[in-house]
UniProtKB/Swiss-Prot annotation:
UniProt source species: Thermus aquaticus
Protein name: Large ribosomal subunit protein uL24
Gene3D superfamilies (alphabetical): 2.30.30.30
Listed GO MF terms: rRNA binding; structural constituent of ribosome
GO cellular component, one term: ribonucleoprotein complex
Function field: One of two assembly initiator proteins, it binds directly to the 5'-end of the 23S rRNA, where it nucleates assembly of the 50S subunit. One of the proteins that surrounds the polypeptide exit tunnel on the outside of the subunit.
Gene: rplX
Annotated PROSITE patterns: RIBOSOMAL_L24
């Protein structure tokens, strides 16, 4: 059984370790099989592309590469600090992701 990724698409995260330590960005994609996330503006790599209708000249394009999920920490919308994730049950039985520091919800209510 594979581990669950503690962040979701759209979360604002802080990179906690590595070359990009201290950078803040929004999660563009989550790759659960690789236990990785793609964060906007972080871990940019240059990729060679062939000529196509989208890139008529071809050449090199900068794009985000995946980071291991353990390197990022979600930023709590309530207290504004990077935090670990706890699971919490609401009165109606739903399970949500909660901030380990203040107990506020990390899940956006729809």
């Amino acid at each position: 059984m594979q581990a669950k990724v503690h962040v979701k698409k759209g979360d604002t995260v802080l990179v906690a370790s590595g070359k990009y330590k201290g950078r803040v960005g929004k999660v563009k994609a989550v790759l659960p099989r690789k236990m990785a996330v793609i964060v906007e503006g972080v871990n940019l790599v240059k990729k060679a592309v062939r000529p196509s209708p989208k890139h008529p000249q071809g050449g090199f394009v900068e794009q985000e590469a995946p980071l291991h999920a353990s390197k990022v920490r979600p930023i709590c919308p309530a207290c504004g600090k990077p935090t670990r994730v706890r699971k919490k049950f609401l009165e109606d039985g739903r399970k949500i992701r909660a901030c380990a520091k203040c107990g506020g919800s990390l899940d956006v209510e729809e």
